[in-house]
Each structure stands twice: as structure tokens, then as C-alpha cells.
Amino acid sequence: MYGQMSRPLIVFLLILSVCQSIHYEPNWESLDSRPLPSWYDEAKIGIFLHWGVFSVPSFYSEWFWKRWKDGEPSVVNFMKQNYRPDFTYADFAPMFQTEFYDPNKWADLFQAAGARYVVQVTKHVEGFTSWPSKYSWNWNAMDVGPKRDLVGELASAIRNRTNIHFGVYHCLYEWFNPLFLQDTANKFQTNDFVMRKTLPELYELVNKYEPDLLWSDGDWMGPDWYWNSTIFLAWLYNESPVKDKIIVNDRWGYNTRCKHGGFWDCADKFNPGKLMPHKWEDCMAIDKQSWGYRRTTTVDELYSIKELIALLIEIVSFGGNLLVNVGPTSYGTIAPIFEERLRQMGSWLDVNGDAIYATKPWTYQNDSMTPGVWYTSKAGTSGTEVYAITIKWPSSVLTLADPVVSIDTTVSLLGYSGSVKYKPGVAGGIEIYAPDLNIEDIPCLWAWTFKMTGLKNA
């Protein structure tokens, strides 16, 4: 008995020893060999939060300060009409009060939205940190404005109330930091800004909050060697407190996007429209004009829930994740229209989550005959399960060209307990007879999922 029990223990210890012996070198060949922790691919859906001093003017976009300095007419006129002549951008910071910020409510909302990870902007290009950073004196949320640790509060709420993974966004550069401007003037032959500001902040963020995901940005201003990216990532993977679970993106230098990193997002609102050779993400905003909150937003500038669901389905069918951005207000709330979108998305996922979470792309990503039908798949107890998700409710028959039926094929409609009939298509494929339902009996709105098992080509 002792020998039988000790054998699996020995195997476990050997595996553990091998895992602990892996050491990543500070070069991309070594760093890119690190396997992506499985939770990220299984998660599929995240929430992005752009929140900072730019949320106070809440005009134009989160690039308000830069556009003001660049002389953008709409921003210049806005300032002339509403603020005294000597008003500076720093004067907005004390007005960033976040007085209604309740991280517990936010955490509950994100859970209701069906999100499996959250990425909070901890520092955007304005340089203001949402945590009490030692390296951003008097330009952080504890010293000025809220007088709160906005990052720590949300991290605690997420971890205490949900099963959501907590991530942080950090911008490598800052528009007007004198150290960065001097490095730029020196053509990056110096990196004082990186050594005295960027890297200390990154180490501080990771050690203090132990995030599951680190979303880097602002990389386009310099190459990876200027940012010391590979050295930092080697520490992150080898020595940091999150070395076994952390996931990063590809924004570590203007020469790294779509080439290196844990997952690729390549560009904002990236949708390749095809399978990619690497795990990828589409980060997008419900407000099509801005990542930060705008007081001037109109309904026609927002993603409708049907558009959002259709995008989610398409992205997942191609093997991607969808990171959905909302911009909170300066007083710490999420506007009702954005909350509604998130809750609607969650209600759809309550019915159709099996076709999204932990799925893999199928042989076909969209049907070759019927437009608006997308496929996902996952391993089931009796073989591969294939999900056909249609963004148009079929009036009677849904004809699909790509699934090949067998005598063992079964078809069901997610959220519906009744039987679903089908027959082989005349020219191949399958013809699915949509249940004759009253509108109040249809299991969900916006898109519907037919689950197929026992296909010959699954």
C-alpha cells in the first residue's frame, strides 16, 4: 500500500521540480516559450476600465490633456468657455473626488456581466496613478483627489466577492514627464525615465497587488530595449509573486506588437477576421469615440447590445478574447447606459455561456452558406460539441452547409428544454427546424445557439 501511494507522489514531486527549474532568460526567444496560463483562453470576456483625471473634464476623450496642448480647436474652445485663463490640467486632479465609488457594486456588476477578468487602468499617459505610488509624488489618488487607493479597493472587492481575475493596465510613458522628454531628446541613448519611473512603478504594482494580468501600453514611443522590457519580464516570470499565473500582452516596445508577449492585441479594436497563430484579444470600447467617459456621448455613438453580442461571437469564433471597455465618471459611478449594456451581455451569457467560455475554434469559423452564423466547439463527454450561433432567429429552418450529420447526431437549443428536429441537407450539411415559439418563450434575445453532437466532421 505504501509503495502504491508513494508512486504518484514521486511523480508529482518530479513534475513540480521540473516546473520550478524552468528559468526564463531576458530575451524574446526564451520569454515567448512560456506557456500561457490556461485561465486566460478559457475566460473569453473581460472588462476594461479607463478612469483617471481625464474623467473630470469628461470631454473629447482620455487624450484630453494632449489634445489641449496640441491645440485641438474643440478642446481649446471648451477650456476657454468653461475655465479661467490660468487653469492647468493639474487643477482637475482635486476635482477627481470619486465620492460615489463603491468597488463592491462594481465587482457585482462585472460578475453579472459575465466577465471572467477585469483590467483597471492604473496609470494612463497623463501619469496620474490610481494607487499611492512612491514614484508619483503628489500625482496619485492618495495624495490628491480621492485620497483613496482606487486599485487596492477594487482588487479586494473583485477577489472577495467574485471568481473574476484581476488585472492592471499600466502605460509605459507619460506625455509631459521631463525625464521622458529628456530621454527622447537624447534619442533614447539614456533611459532615466524608465529606471526612475516606469520600472519602479511596475515592480511596485506587481508586488503590492499581485495581479493575474498585466496589460502594458504606451510602448509605441520607444523600442523594447529602451523600456528594459525583457529584463522586467524575466523577473516577472522567474521571481515575482505572480510568476506562475501572470499573463501579459504584447505592448513592450514599438517592435514587439503582434510578435512577442503572452497574448497579442496588435492594435486597439483589433479584429483580424481569421484564425491567428497565437492567442489574441480585441480590446474595444462601448463608446466608439472614446475610452474615457464623455458627458457629450450620444446613443448613436455607442455599441448597441446586438452589435456587442455579434462582435463577441465573431471574436470568440476566431479564437480571440473580447475586452469590453467602459469609462467610469469622475464621481465614481458607471453610467446607466453602460451598466445596461453589461447586464444585457450577462443575461445573454447566462443562456449561451456554454458556447463561449472555454471553447475552441471549430474547423469552420462561420457558415459557408448562411450569413450571420458562427461556430465554436469544445470537448464533451461523448466527443466534440459544436455550437452554431446565429444572430438572426430562423423563421422556420436554419440551413447550415458545414456540419456533417451522422446517425448519432443530436441538436438542441441552449436555454430551451424541448426537442429540436433536424434532417440532413439536400446538398449536404444540416437543416435545423427552429422550435415554433411565442416571443416570450424564446430563451434569449440578440443571438441564439444550436448545440450539435455526434457530427461526422466534429
Where are these regions (language model features)?
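Cleavable N-terminal signal peptides of Sec/SRP-targeted secreted and luminal proteins
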Residues: S6-S21
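Mature catalytic domains of secreted/periplasmic carbohydrate-active enzymes
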Residues: C19-A458
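N-terminal secretory signal peptides that target proteins for export/translocation
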Residues: M1-G3
